[in-house]
C-alpha cells in the first residue's frame, strides 16, 4: 500500500547504509508514483518507527503497518542523512 519494500539491517546493509545492525529497517525499493515516493522516501533511508512503535525487523514493520489500516495514515520516523524526521503517509483505500 505504501509502495515501498524494506529489509532488516544485517552487517552488510549496516556498512552499505551507515546504519546500526538490528536498529530499524532499511528501504530497499520505492515504487514511483506511490505514497512513499510522494512523501520523498528513497532507497537507503532507515525507518525506526511506524506510528511511534519501534521496528527492527520486517515482520515488526509489517505488523505495525497492519495496525494503521484503520486510520489510513502512517507516521514513520525516518533517518534522512544525519538527521531523523517524522513523515506522514496516507494509505490508498
Question: Where do the model's predicted regions map?
Answer:
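C-terminal recognition in membrane/secretory proteostasis and scaffolding
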Residues: 1-93
Amino acid at each position: 500500500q505504501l509502495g515501498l519494500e524494506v529489509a532488516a539491517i544485517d552487517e552488510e546493509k549496516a556498512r552499505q547504509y551507515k546504519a546500526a545492525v538490528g536498529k530499524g529497517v532499511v528501504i530497499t525499493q520505492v515504487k514511483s508514483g506511490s505514497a512513499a515516493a510522494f512523501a520523498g522516501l528513497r532507497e537507503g533511508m532507515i525507518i525506526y518507527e511506524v506510528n511511534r512503535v519501534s521496528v527492527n525487523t520486517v515482520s515488526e514493520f509489517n505488523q505495525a503497518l497492519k495496525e494503521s489500516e484503520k486510520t489510513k495514515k502512517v507516521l514513520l520516523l525516518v533517518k534522512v542523512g544525519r538527521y531523523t524526521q517524522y513523515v506522514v503517509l496516507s494509505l490508498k483505500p
